[in-house]
């Protein structure tokens, strides 16, 4: 399963959750790449290259983290790279962008994942529901 990890950063360094997102991606896929979005990304792409091959969308128009703009870029990258799974941190920033990306791709987004299994090539995610009163398995 070809996987793309969206690396979150603050403009100077990657956020710590990005490493956890890469760790999850490695557990479910052998074919991963990371995507860094923004402007003046040299420091972030160098740091990201320690995790996996890096794809960078570096442009002044991407300096502000506007979800609509970034989601369209992620969609173009996902289509060009034949990505099957997009992974990101569990932050408000990532949920906004990945939710829009999923909509543009005609897919779905699973958030706040608390567990996963890979059974016969099928990824199953455990997510809380009803304010944590129950858990659901999403296929």
Identify the residue ranges that each predicted region occupies.
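N-terminal glycine-rich FAD/FM-binding segment characteristic of electron-transfer flavoproteins
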Residues: 1-139
